């Protein structure tokens, strides 16, 4: 339990029963409620200031502890050794009648509320009310409250547990000009980066669109070139076919003329059966003619042989005309079959040969006609193939044109969609949205995620606000959502601060002598911040007391702010180890919870009276609420 160290005074002359004292009651007049905090402040004053600041009574109590086995420390009977009630007290009172236990709890709570273990940030000045002082003089005092409120912003309300006590406290974030300026610079930088990113994205999008258009144009040009090439090939093929057709026609005309010149008699004479029979008879009689006929039939005859064979044909024609005039009908052969004979077989062979010969001669004489027919068939086939090829080419060209058109339409639609594209909203679950909203910090709180200074205020005593210990160890309990803060209170901190100031001034003077030109304006402040007097050899011995408190009811979204509001863990641990190494821990006192009914009657009465006053002040405060 923290105790306020006071000067112990002992006097030889003591009074067994001090004079009766009258204590001024707290004012219970009607007050205005212009501000809820002001009302709470005045009520909290009645509970703590009026009783707790009466140090004259502590001095009077010290007189009552003369020649007693205990001393008066912070208005309470205490000793370094453990109390021995049986040997020291003749008529020991009960714990309830002594009032030490209850008054010690009030004193301990007052010590916490008055921030003996915290660094003071602000304290409201007391109002001095008198008949000569007009009411208008209170305006400057009342004006300081809004000024203080403008310098900080509420973070949250929570419950603080310290020792055996539980307090309702309020945490504030102290405004810092450096952090505000840094935040503003970061926001401007983010804005510039965002604007630059937007421009880069727009430029990249424009380049992509241009590249896409260029590729589409290249594809379109390639398609057009392909179609033009196909058209040119088609026209070229058509011209080649027409030229080939004309060439063949000219060749056919030449062949016809040649055949007309070569062919003397009509082709119908070659089919005269009488002439063929006469020719076969002539071949039977003339072996030379038979050989010539065979040569002509095989197609091995030359021009002279053909001319000679034509002469034999003319002779056979003349004989047929003489034997078979126009008015005479040809003789009809008997249909009765005759027995086969060798001569007949020979005659049949000659007849077949003659027929073959006639066919060969007919083929030779009328050669241009089948060639012409073959050429016409070939031309028809080629024209059909050309037509089919042209039709298929035309169909392919039409398909390609349709594909190009469809791709153009699709690309235009895609381009329009990209231009008018709307980013679809993500569908998120309601629980996730609610959790995200709960975890969101305000714009002001986001500025102080790093390096915030937390201010603490007791709701039951709003006249003062204190710094949360900067050099402390913060531990987060995930199971109970509680925060444990541990730090070391140095009781002779003023002495150490004086030593620090003296050392800094000495170092600055030495540095100015050595480096006058290199001196910078902000170097003094940096040295003052970085300098730690505890690590100096001649540092005063720190008198310390370790402290621990627990905060509960803080939303986890503020954990990051609280974690980063204290100094780094390595630095804090290093300083704590140094304090434990060179410092002296203050020993605690043992309270005497029982007093003697006769020897300590006045002390017991004083403790009970103070306890009643405190209870009355708390009761009136609850009643007004």
UniProtKB/Swiss-Prot annotation:
Skewed-composition ranges (Basic residues): 20-31
GO biological process, one term: chromatin remodeling
Record field: compositional bias (Basic and acidic residues): 194-214, 221-234, 342-352, 368-388, 396-420
Chain segments carrying region Disordered: 1-53, 194-234, 254-273, 324-434
Residue spans of biased composition, Acidic residues class: 35-53
Annotated GO MF terms: ATP-dependent H2AZ histone chaperone activity
Assigned keywords, A-Z: Activator, Chromatin regulator, Nucleus, Transcription, Transcription regulation
Location(s), subcellular: Nucleus
Biased composition (Polar residues): 261-270, 353-364
Entry superkingdom: Eukaryota
Gene Ontology CC, one term: Swr1 complex
Matches recorded under Pfam families: Swc3
Its job: Component of the SWR1 complex which mediates the ATP-dependent exchange of histone H2A for the H2A variant HZT1 leading to transcriptional regulation of selected genes by chromatin remodeling. Involved in chromosome stability.
Homology family: Belongs to the SWC3 family.
Note: Present with 1380 molecules/cell in log phase SD medium.
Record text on subunit structure and interactions: Component of the SWR1 chromatin remodeling complex composed of at least ACT1, ARP4, RVB1, RVB2, ARP6, YAF9, VPS71, VPS72, SWC3, SWC4, SWC5, SWC7 and SWR1, and perhaps BDF1.
Full protein name: SWR1-complex protein 3
UniProt organism field: Saccharomyces cerevisiae (strain ATCC 204508 / S288c)
Gene: SWC3
């Amino acid at each position: 339990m923290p105790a306020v160290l006071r000067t112990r005074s002992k006097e030889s002359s003591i009074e067994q029963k001090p004079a009766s004292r009258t204590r001024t009651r707290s004012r219970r007049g009607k007050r205005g409620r212009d501000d809820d905090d002001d009302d709470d402040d005045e009520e909290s004053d009645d509970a703590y200031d009026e009783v707790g600041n009466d140090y004259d009574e502590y001095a009077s109590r010290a007189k009552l502890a003369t020649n007693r086995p205990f001393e008066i420390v912070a208005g309470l009977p205490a000793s370094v050794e453990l109390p021995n009630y049986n040997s020291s007290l003749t008529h020991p009172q009960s714990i309830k009648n002594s009032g030490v236990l209850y008054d010690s709890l009030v004193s301990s709570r007052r010590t916490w509320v008055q921030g003996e273990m915290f660094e003071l940030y602000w304290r409201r000045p007391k109002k001095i009310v008198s008949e000569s002082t007009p009411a208008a003089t209170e305006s400057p005092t009342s004006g300081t409250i809004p000024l203080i409120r403008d310098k900080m912003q509420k973070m949250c309300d929570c419950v603080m547990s310290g020792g055996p006590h539980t307090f309702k406290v309020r945490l504030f974030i102290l405004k810092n000009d450096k952090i505000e300026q840094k935040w503003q610079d970061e926001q401007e930088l983010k804005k510039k980066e965002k604007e630059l990113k937007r421009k880069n994205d727009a430029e990249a999008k424009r380049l992509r669109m241009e590249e896409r258009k260029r590729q589409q144009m290249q594809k379109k040009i390639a398609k057009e070139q392909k179609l033009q090439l196909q058209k040119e090939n088609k026209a070229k093929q058509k011209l080649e076919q027409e030229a080939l057709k004309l060439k063949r026609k000219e060749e056919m005309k030449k062949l016809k003329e040649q055949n007309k010149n070569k062919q003397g008699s009509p082709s119908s004479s070659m089919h005269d059966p009488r002439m063929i029979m006469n020719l076969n008879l002539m071949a039977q009689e003339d072996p030379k003619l038979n050989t010539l006929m065979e040569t002509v039939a095989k197609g091995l005859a030359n021009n002279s042989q053909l001319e000679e064979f034509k002469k034999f044909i003319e002779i056979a024609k003349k004989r047929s005309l003489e034997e078979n005039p126009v008015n005479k009908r040809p003789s009809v052969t008997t249909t009765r079959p005759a027995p086969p004979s060798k001569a007949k077989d020979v005659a049949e062979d000659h007849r077949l040969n003659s027929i073959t010969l006639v066919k060969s001669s007919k083929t030779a004489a009328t050669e241009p006609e089948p060639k012409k027919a073959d050429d016409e068939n070939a031309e028809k086939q080629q024209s059909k193939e050309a037509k089919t090829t042209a039709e298929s080419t035309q169909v392919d060209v039409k398909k390609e044109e349709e594909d190009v058109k469809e791709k153009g339409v699709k690309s235009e639609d895609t381009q329009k969609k990209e231009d008018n594209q709307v980013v679809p909203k993500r569908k998120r679950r309601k629980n996730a949205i609610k959790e995200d909203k709960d975890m969101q910090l305000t714009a002001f709180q986001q500025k102080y995620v790093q390096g915030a200074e937390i201010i603490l205020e007791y709701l039951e005593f709003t006249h003062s606000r204190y710094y949360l210990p900067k050099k402390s160890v913060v531990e987060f309990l995930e199971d109970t959502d509680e925060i444990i803060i541990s730090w070391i209170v140095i009781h002779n901190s003023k002495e150490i601060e004086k030593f620090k100031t003296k050392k800094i001034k000495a170092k600055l003077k030495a540095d100015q002598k050595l480096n006058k030109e290199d001196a910078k304006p902000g170097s003094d402040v940096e040295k003052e911040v970085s300098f730690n007097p505890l690590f100096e050899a001649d540092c005063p011995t720190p008198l310390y007391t370790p402290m621990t408190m627990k905060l509960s009811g803080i939303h986890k979204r503020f954990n990051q702010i609280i974690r980063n509001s204290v100094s780094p863990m390595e630095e804090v641990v290093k300083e704590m180890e140094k304090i434990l190494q060179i410092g002296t821990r203050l020993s605690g006192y043992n309270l005497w919870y029982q007093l003697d009914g006769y020897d300590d009657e006045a002390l017991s009465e004083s403790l009970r009276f103070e306890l009643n006053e405190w209870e009355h002040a708390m009761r009136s405060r609850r009643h007004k609420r």
